[in-house]
Amino acid sequence: MSVISMKQLLEAGVHFGHQTRRWNPKMKEYIFTERNGIYIIDLQKTVRMVEIAYNAVRQMAADGGKILFIGTKKQAQDAVREEAERCGMFYVNQRWLGGMLTNFETIKKRIARLNELEEIEGTEYWSKLTKKEQAQLLHEKEKLEKNLGGIKGMKSLPDMAFVIDPRRERIAVSELRKLGIPIVAIVDTNCDPDEIDYVIPGNDDAIRAVKLLTSKIADAVIEGRQGVDTSATVDEEEAEVAEETESMESAEDLDADLIEEEAE
């Protein structure tokens, strides 16, 4: 029994890694083979590691923990927002402000400002402002919403994080590790798995691959919080696994940031 099948992974292109010249040797154990200059990820390992990550996230959610979804690259933005909202968790999908976690007290002040701006819009006080003043406040609100909208309800640090492409999100990963917050991540062949607590070997560039794996993490949160099994469990026959394996073989700094934000 597994929470994800090799067929799902293959169809989403999870097995495609980066070019062989762009790799991290530490990912060698997760690589199945090489095809036309591209590394092919071992999906049998991905299946097992998705399940390990799923169980860890489910238990964290069952214990009342908060999971922060992080993915700012274009291919991940929609999936991160949609799946985090679906499971009622927080997310960062635009820009990671340096110190977002390690200087969280300052971030909370910016979140409070965002909430304040949302509350005054449309009030009597708002109607007394000039058009120019209203425009300035709306511009300020839009910028805060863009960067902090996904965490404006987050009153304290998260208990766990799910990261898409830890190499790109290296500042976030550094802050998470400094704070001792466990990390679950989609780790492609050019990433360092040693920085991640729960590695999910997989393609972090394809939209379908990112969506599939992110949705499984969201399912784990929902199951943990509600006690409802939302996972699409699969009981695969050995012949099916062999067939899919064959298919796989043939497949081809906060202050500076805030100052910059205000200056824009």
From Swiss-Prot:
Top-rank lineage group of the source organism: Bacteria
One GO BP annotation of this record: translation
A GO CC term attached to the entry: cytosolic small ribosomal subunit
Ribonucleoprotein listed as a keyword: yes
Listed Acidic residues bias regions: 234-264
PROSITE patterns given in the database record: RIBOSOMAL_S2_1 (PS00962)
Region (Disordered) location: 228-264
GO terms for MF: structural constituent of ribosome
This protein's UniProt keywords: Ribonucleoprotein, Ribosomal protein
Pfam families on file: Ribosomal_S2
Family label: Belongs to the universal ribosomal protein uS2 family.
NCBIfam families: rpsB_bact (TIGR01011)
HAMAP family per UniProt: Ribosomal_uS2_B (MF_00291_B)
Name of the protein in its database record: Small ribosomal subunit protein uS2
Organism phylogeny: Bacteria, Bacillati, Bacillota, Clostridia, Eubacteriales
